[in-house]
Amino acid sequence: KVKVVMLECRESFEHCFCVSMGTNKTDKYDAAVRITEHEVLAEVRDEKLGAAFSFVSASSCDFTPEFVQENQKKLHIPKITDRSMLKPISDLEYWNQFDEKCMSCGGCNTVCGTCSCFDTVDVIYQEGSRSGERRRVWSSCMLETFTQTAGGGRARKTPGANMRFKVLHKFYDFADRFVKDGSHGIACDAQMCIGCGRCDMRCPKKISFFDAVDGLAAEIEKMNTGEEA
């Protein structure tokens, strides 16, 4: 029942690394649209979707959507081939730099197309009553209060630990849990990051998620070659 309409993107901007993630192009859409200053071009593949636009005055044209072919940035994706690597990766001093840089605002999560962390809260309808509900609400893994329990304890206590969690979730955990063999056809071995670069644009402290991931790839390379990380 869901129809997918793709808005064409032909030009990369400075923070984007979609080509590295394999998300720069697709053939999985029901309609594609190009919007210019003077006209709208559309390729409609789905008959039912085409019928929905029958009231529009349009003329036939030869339109095939184009895609970004190259970015200004090229990401080195961290190669985590075994779970035994997770402990030494977690212990890297590399993550400590984010303790000073990150202000834990969660802005990067709010603009991310794939962030889906949530919290569970109890909502009481009226003070003193016993009626209410338990709700699952959207949250941010970069917030100081994320994972905080009723007793005040926290699983991750620093911005650096939160950054480590986010990076590993995007570039290891998701694929390890859901698409181990890549059979689902998700780009780049099912990495959760799509390389849109919106988080880099949003961060008020100018922290680059691209640099964080690229830097981790370099640290892992050092580990694998026996160099000092």
Language-model regions, residue ranges each:
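Iron-sulfur-associated redox domains of electron-transfer enzymes in respiratory
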Residues: 1-87, 95, 115-118, 126
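Secondary-structure boundary elements
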Residues: 10, 104-105, 222
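Glycine-centered flexibility sites
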Residues: 22, 106, 195-197
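Short gly/pro-enriched beta-turn/loop segments at secondary-structure junctions
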Residues: 35-37, 96-97, 103-107, 136
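Ferredoxin-type iron-sulfur electron-transfer modules in oxidoreductases and energy-metabolism complexes
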Residues: 79-100, 118-229
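Oxyanion-binding "anion nests"
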Residues: 80, 102-113
